[in-house]
UniProtKB/Swiss-Prot annotation:
One of its GO terms (molecular function) is urease activity. This is Urease subunit alpha. It comes from Burkholderia vietnamiensis (strain G4 / LMG 22486). It holds the Pfam family Amidohydro_1. The lineage of its organism: Bacteria, Pseudomonadati, Pseudomonadota, Betaproteobacteria, Burkholderiales. GO terms for biological process: urea catabolic process. Heterotrimer of UreA (gamma), UreB (beta) and UreC (alpha) subunits. Three heterotrimers associate to form the active enzyme. GO terms for cellular component: cytoplasm. The gene is ureC. PROSITE patterns: UREASE_1, UREASE_2, UREASE_3.
Length: 568
């Protein structure tokens, strides 16, 4: 016996299917399901009178033959597609994406459910890969709580706490600090990796930081990003297969942007603040977006350009870079970095895929819990101001959604040599997954999984008779407790450090994972974000021209994903 359901009734029961569209939060962005891996009439769902019961949707197979957890009927939004599927998790990793059920009685089953299988209901939810923030100033450990609650599951950067150096630069300097920070990483339910200080003109001080566990090196103008330091740092990175991140010379003291590009010598580098106000060669750091060896990112304070952006930045910059507003030279330095024209161009360069990544710059001119929000606010603003992308159509914004989700998931992972473990929803990868109700997409996740275990979720009063009574807020779950913490999160280190046995020497509890393939990455590897325009910036008007076109847009006066979500 069959029963024909309306699309609405089907979506309410099993979630949207092929051809259905979903609005992302209160934005103008619509995604459309491209494929449904489930089979109509054979869907699995847990609950009283539902399918996943013994002899029905649940098989008799033993634990070795079934996943530890399945997420049923979820909409997956990732760089590779927008699909409806069941997701299987086994031993902390994504085991399969397909059709779950009982293969003994159901057709087309690719994921067998057994008595050893836990179920997370994904009906009506969107699942994304955990976010990766590659621009972290480790100023306070409480940032990790904020980041995790926002959907970020990997944090890369540097620092030692609220030291003056860390307040301004993302460096964990020297072997002693590196060891202490790696030991501290054991206490937090998030994947972590640390950058050493790259500003020195001879190799050994850099090599010893890589050997101590750094995943890469950070060049920052506040430590002196000279051509000699750049050249030396990249040479060490080439020898150790680690990445270099750079914040270039705002004052153009050691040379102009052309001097910095020349010092790269065609070698791969992640350019932080390839943007309109974050820092770097004034006013034309945006030029580096056209270089094949440059992997460009920007940070979230200027995302997107609004009527309040300029006013906010001056005081923020004075504090972060230890400047004195009573000193004329310090004030001039700050004002040189805040340019409405280049901030506006940054919006468009993100939309066209010239800027490949987006990160926070946490507590140092950036908000650690707003990477995902501001990414999608930028996408919305560009949809409203510029219309559909050529790759999209009147029905959906699928390509734009894939482009923007890649900016904080797969592209940072590729850049820093961790894409073999995290950054996308693909079999074999660590099960760092974020579940969203569509109305709250990008703003407030329903649940965050780390290594296949629930790490944080919206949870009601623990003394209530059911999980939902107020006050409902984010609470840490069992993946953050006891020995489970060290088995559901990763610490990234260099291959040199892993080979040297730092895990045993430092007494680390978390699994350590070496970064790899950092030096052969090019802009062409930045998924959906590989455009290399020829850019010029007028030194007087700051107008930005890319491939002959003036890049300009109006500041937003109102944004989605904002106050209506934060009334309480």
């Amino acid at each position: 016996m069959t029963l024909r359901l309306s699309r609405r009734a089907y979506a309410e029961m099993f979630g949207p299917t092929t051809g259905d569209r979903v609005r992302l939060a209160d934005t103008e962005l619509l995604i459309e399901i491209e494929r449904d891996y489930t089979i109509y009439g054979e869907e699995v769902k847990f609950g009283g009178g539902k399918v996943i019961r013994d002899g029905m949707g649940q098989s008799q197979r033993v634990a070795a033959d079934v996943p530890d957890t399945i997420i049923t009927n979820a909409v997956i939004l990732d760089h590779w597609g927008i699909v409806k599927a069941d997701i299987a998790i086994k031993h902390g990793r994504i085991a399969a994406i397909g059709k779950a059920g009982n293969p003994d009685i159901q057709p087309g089953v690719t994921i067998a459910i057994g008595a050893a299988t836990e179920v997370i209901a994904g009906e009506g939810l969107i699942v994304t890969a955990g976010g990766i923030d590659t621009h972290i100033h480790f100023i306070s450990p409480q940032q990790i709580d904020e980041a995790l609650a926002s959907g970020v599951t990997t944090m890369l950067g540097g620092g030692t706490g609220p030291a003056t150096g860390t307040n301004a630069t993302t460096c964990t300097p020297g072997p002693w600090h590196m060891e202490r920070m790696l030991q501290a990483a054991d206490g937090w339910p998030i994947n972590l990796g640390f950058l050493g200080k790259g500003n020195v003109s001879v190799p050994q001080p850099l090599v010893e930081q890589i050997a101590a566990g750094a995943i890469g090196l950070k060049l920052h103008e506040d430590w002196g990003t000279t051509p000699a330091a750049i050249d030396n740092c990249l040479s060490v990175a080439d020898d150790t297969d680690t990445q270099v991140a750079i914040h270039t010379d705002t004052l153009n003291e050691g040379g102009f942007v052309e001097s910095t590009v020349a010092a790269f010598k065609g070698r791969t580098i992640h350019t932080y603040h390839t943007e309109g106000a974050g820092g770097g060669h004034a006013p034309d750091i945006l030029k580096v977006c056209g270089e094949s060896n440059v992997l460009p990112s920007s940070t979230n304070p200027t995302r997107p350009y609004t009527i309040n952006t300029l006013d906010e930045h001056l005081d923020m910059l004075m504090v972060c870079h230890h400047l004195d507003p009573s000193i004329a030279e310090d004030l001039a330095f700050a004002e040189s970095r805040i340019r409405r024209e280049t901030i506006a161009a940054e919006d468009i360069l993100h939309d066209l895929g010239a800027l490949s990544m987006l990160s926070s710059d946490s507590q140092a001119m950036g908000r650690v819990g707003e990477v995902i929000i501001r990414t999608w606010q930028t996408a919305h603003k560009m949809k409203v101001q510029r219309g559909a992308l050529p790759e999209d159509n009147a029905r959906n914004d699928n390509f734009r959604a894939k482009r923007y989700v890649a900016k904080y998931t797969i592209n940072p992972a590729i850049t820093h040599g961790i894409a073999h473990e995290v950054g996308s929803i693909e079999p074999g990868k660590w099960a760092d997954l974020v579940l969203w109700e569509p109305a709250f997409f990008g703003i407030k996740p329903s649940m965050i999984l780390k290594g296949g275990m629930i790490a944080m979720a919206q949870m009601g009063d623990p003394n209530a008779s059911i999980p939902t009574p107020q006050p409902v807020h984010y609470r840490e779950m069992f993946a953050t407790r006891g020995g489970a913490l060290a088995r559901t999160s990763l610490t990234f280190v260099s291959q040199m450090a892993a080979d040297a046995g730092i895990a045993e020497r430092y007494g680390l509890a978390k699994w350590i994972v070496p970064v790899r393939n950092c030096r052969n990455v090019t802009k062409a590897d930045m998924i959906h974000n590989a455009w290399r325009p020829s850019i010029s910036v007028d030194p007087e008007t700051y107008d930005v021209i890319a491939d002959g076109q003036l890049l300009t847009c109006e500041p937003a006066t109102v944004l989605p994903m904002a106050q209506r979500y934060f009334l309480f």
